[in-house]
Amino acid sequence: MNRCLFALLLTAILLTACGSSSTASETTESGIEVHQIKMGAGAQGEDRALYLAMHNHGSETDQLIGASSGAADVVQLQNGTEIVEVIPVYANTEFVFIPDGYHVMLIGLKQELHVGDEIEVVLQFRDHEDLTIRVPVGEATEHEH
């Protein structure tokens, strides 16, 4: 009985550790690291928010000026529901995208995205090179709009 309970507990812990956010990180050559990448599953034509954390390891402030993806008709930078032209990426600082705050919005998914799928999104910076990130698709959240 104890072995079965232990095996069930261990399985639950391992499954929890394999959640929908990416533990991998992507980094530009000049030091902007992107990690904690997550986005929910969705049907074709729906919109989905992409959340992540950006850490600028450099000594100069930069700006995220755009994003693109072949997985959606339109990709926008947003703060809440408002479109923004830039998101500051301050030097030696980490910035976390959150629901109802800054995020990347994928509008009009071109195909249904299931839990476990992965898409690519290109982040465009004012002063750094573009960064292509791999986005794991997880469970949809109540914050999708």
Task: Explain the meaning of each model-derived region.
Residues 1-6:
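Bacterial N-terminal signal peptides that target proteins for export
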Residues 14-17:
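C-terminal motif of bacterial Sec signal peptides marking the signal peptidase cleavage site
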Residues 19-145:
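Compact, glycine-rich, soluble single-domain proteins
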